[in-house]
A protein has these predicted regions:
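Active-site-adjacent loop/helix segments that line or gate small-molecule/cofactor pockets in enzymes
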Residues: 17-60
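Active-site and channel-lining beta-strand-loop segments
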Residues: 55-77
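Adenylate-forming
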Residues: 42, 84-86, 168-173
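Short, well-ordered beta-strand elements within core beta-sheets of diverse protein domains
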Residues: 65, 84-87, 201-204
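Conserved active-site and cofactor/substrate-binding residues in soluble primary-metabolism enzymes
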Residues: 22, 26, 61, 89, ...
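PLP-dependent aspartate aminotransferase-fold enzymes
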Residues: 120-205
Length: 205
C-alpha cells in the first residue's frame, strides 16, 4: 500500500487520469452492501491500492491491457487476473479452445476425458510426482497438502510463508496474535470463527 497518496498522485498524474466516476463509485458502494468485502477476492479489492483512483471495474481486456468502465486503456502492472493469465488477456488460442469446449457442453456429472490427459501431462512434466490431485482453488489445494503432510508425518504443526487462502489451518496463526499474518495476508485480521483448539498449530516465517 502507498502511504503518501498525495505525493504519489503529484508525481504520476494519476489523479487526473483515473479519478473514479460517480457511476463507478456508486457501483462499488452497492457491491459492498451486497457482497462482503465488495467482491470475492481480497486480491482484487481496490481499497488495498488507491481507493479513490483505482479503476475497480473493467470493461474488456487484451494482452497486457485492461479498459475501465470509462473506456480508459491501462497497462495491468498487477497480477494479470490473480496470476492466471500468464499468456496475457484474451489470447486467441486460449479463447478458441475455451469456446470449443463450451460449444460441446462444459459441465456434466460425468467425467471429462481432458482431466486424464491433463493429469498425464502434469506427471510427465513433473517426474517427482506419481499422481495428480485437482482442486477448485489454491486455498483448497493448500489445505489438501497440509492434511496429507499431517497424516503422513503424524505431526500437526505447520510452518508456512506467504498467502495460503482462508481455511482454518491458515487463519489460526492469528489466534495467538492478530499480527502474525500482517506480512502474509492483511494487517490486524481477527481469527473469529476459527476453533481456539488450533492455536499454536500454524507458524508463519
Amino acid at each position: 500500500a502507498i502511504k503518501n497518496k498525495s505525493l504519489f498522485n503529484q508525481n504520476t498524474g494519476l489523479d487526473k487520469k483515473l479519478k473514479k466516476s460517480h457511476k463507478i463509485e456508486k457501483l462499488w458502494h452497492k457491491a459492498k452492501k451486497l457482497i462482503p468485502n465488495g467482491n470475492m477476492l481480497l486480491s482484487k479489492n481496490p481499497d488495498r491500492f488507491l481507493p479513490n483512483l483505482w479503476p475497480t471495474y473493467f470493461s474488456k481486456t487484451k494482452g497486457c491491457y485492461v479498459w475501465s468502465l470509462e473506456n480508459k486503456k491501462l497497462i495491468d502492472f498487477s497480477v494479470m487476473g490473480v496470476g492466471t493469465n500468464i499468456l496475457g488477456y484474451s489470447r486467441k488460442e486460449v479463447d478458441n479452445a475455451v469456446r470449443s469446449v463450451i460449444n460441446k457442453g462444459n459441465l456434466s456429472t460425468l467425467n471429462c476425458p481432458e482431466e486424464v490427459s491433463l493429469a498425464e501431462k502434469l506427471v510427465e512434466l513433473h517426474p517427482w510426482a506419481d499422481m495428480v490431485k485437482f482442486a477448485r482453488t489454491g486455498g483448497e489445494a493448500n489445505s489438501i497438502a497440509v492434511r496429507i503432510a499431517r497424516s503422513s508425518t503424524n505431526r500437526h504443526n505447520i510452518a508456512f510463508c506467504g498467502y495460503h487462502g482462508w481455511h482454518d489451518w491458515y487463519i489460526s496463526a492469528n489466534i495467538k496474535s492478530s499480527k502474525n499474518l500482517n506480512e502474509h495476508l492483511m494487517s490486524g485480521l481477527n481469527a473469529t470463527g476459527v476453533p481456539k483448539e488450533l492455536k499454536n498449530t500454524s507458524f508463519p516465517f
